[in-house]
């Protein structure tokens, strides 16, 4: 069976009509907006349907749309090797309750992607087996990829600017 976007969308709408919030297509790629509480059902259907067979979770990531509600989005990219077809699932996540169900039961490879998204954005994946920080130190406060994180940082010294940088640094004198 040759898969195309209308076929995939029609199968999803027929099987889980109340789970979908909308869809869009950009440069031939299908994106489907899913209710957060139904992401596991939609992902399981896409994986287990004998005609669709989206057996591979390529990646998932977080996006911060500061000033919009829902503020965050978790984006999942799935691939059907059998049909050579991709689909993108998008789940809006509220700033007040930044949580979405984990997909680690369906794809164990989601483990590190979810931990990274938690670490960088503070989105909690409920049901995750070990949602600890993965990139930042345990005592780090906040989530560095949120757009409201202060950017006050020390300028890095390179060969082109080291004289200017080092002129203001107190160095130990021997």
Curated annotation (Swiss-Prot):
Membrane topology: Peripheral membrane protein
A Gene Ontology term for the protein's cellular component: plasma membrane
Enzyme class: translocase
Domain of life: Bacteria
HAMAP family, A to Z: NDH1_NuoC
Biological role: NDH-1 shuttles electrons from NADH, via FMN and iron-sulfur (Fe-S) centers, to quinones in the respiratory chain. The immediate electron acceptor for the enzyme in this species is believed to be ubiquinone. Couples the redox reaction to proton translocation (for every two electrons transferred, four hydrogen ions are translocated across the cytoplasmic membrane), and thus conserves the redox energy in a proton gradient.
Protein name per UniProt: NADH-quinone oxidoreductase subunit C
Organism name: Roseiflexus castenholzii (strain DSM 13941 / HLO8)
Gene: nuoC
């Amino acid at each position: 069976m040759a898969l195309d976007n209308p076929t995939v969308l029609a199968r999803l709408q027929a099987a889980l009509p109340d789970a979908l919030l909308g869809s869009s297509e950009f440069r031939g790629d299908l994106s489907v907006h899913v209710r957060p509480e139904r992401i596991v059902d939609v992902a399981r259907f896409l994986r287990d349907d004998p005609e669709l067979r989206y057996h591979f979770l390529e990646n998932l990531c977080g996006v911060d749309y500061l000033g919009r509600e829902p503020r965050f989005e978790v984006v999942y990219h799935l691939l059907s090797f059998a049909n050579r077809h991709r689909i993108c699932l998008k789940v809006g996540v509220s700033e007040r309750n930044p949580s979405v169900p984990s997909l680690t039961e369906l794809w164990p490879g989601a483990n590190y992607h979810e931990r990274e998204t938690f670490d960088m954005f503070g989105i909690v994946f409920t049901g995750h087996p070990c949602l600890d920080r993965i990139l930042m130190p345990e005592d780090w406060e906040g989530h560095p990829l949120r757009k409201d994180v202060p950017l006050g940082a020390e300028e890095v010294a390179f060969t082109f600017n080291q004289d200017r940088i080092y002129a203001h640094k107190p160095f130990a004198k021997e």
